[in-house]
């Protein structure tokens, strides 16, 4: 399975935005510099997050981006959908009829390969949905010294 680099970048952007004080914003260029990623690509990612209601953006001198809801209300699946889209991971090509032969294929009710892949996809969606970014933020809080990122956010907020 492949997740784009935008998915990981999105997770870190959201974790960084969680460090902002209420009512404050940060410019995306600071985020791209901090993460060492392309600003133009990160702006596209932020637009996707904005479209899904995960962040809010404000234009102008004191503009920037901020979370639009708490991390406890954002799951890995929400980010996945924002960045990767709502398309299914697997779409059947209906190869069962060719595999069995046309006549036998007519008797088959459901493809066992499709059933298995649907179960895998459902498990993935369930797991992604069950993990919130607040859980990840809590783990980061317990395992890392976040002083530097907090100081950095305070210096760059608007």
Question: Model segments located where?
Answer:
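Short alpha-helical segments that sit at the start of domains
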Residues: 1-14
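A short alpha-helical element within helix-turn-helix/winged-helix DNA-binding domains
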Residues: 26-36
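Key DNA-contact positions within bacterial/archaeal DNA-binding proteins
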Residues: 40
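Glycine-centered, phosphate/nucleic-acid-interacting loop/turn motifs that mediate DNA/RNA or nucleotide
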Residues: 52-53
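Minor-groove-contacting beta-hairpin "wing" of winged helix-turn-helix DNA-binding domains
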Residues: 61-68
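Conserved segment of winged-helix/HTH DNA-binding domains
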Residues: 71-97
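C-terminal regulatory/oligomerization modules of transcriptional regulators
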Residues: 92-158
